[in-house]
């Protein structure tokens, strides 16, 4: 998973 994908799974785009 790329950084952007992880951000979305974490909660959303920071």
UniProtKB/Swiss-Prot annotation:
Similarity remark: Belongs to the scolopendra toxin 4 family.
- CC per GO annotation: extracellular region
Give the tissue specificity: Expressed by the venom gland.
Where's it found, cell-wise?
Answer: Secreted
Q: What is this protein called?
A: Scolopendra 5885.28 Da toxin
Q: Where are the transmembrane segments?
A: none
Species for this entry: Scolopendra viridicornis nigra (Brazilian giant centipede)
Q: Which domain of life is it from?
A: Eukaryota
Q: Which UniProt keywords apply?
A: Neurotoxin, Secreted, Toxin
Single GO molecular function: toxin activity
Which coarse location class applies to the principal site listed for this UniProt protein?
A: secreted
Is Hydrolase one of the keywords UniProt gives this record?
Answer: no
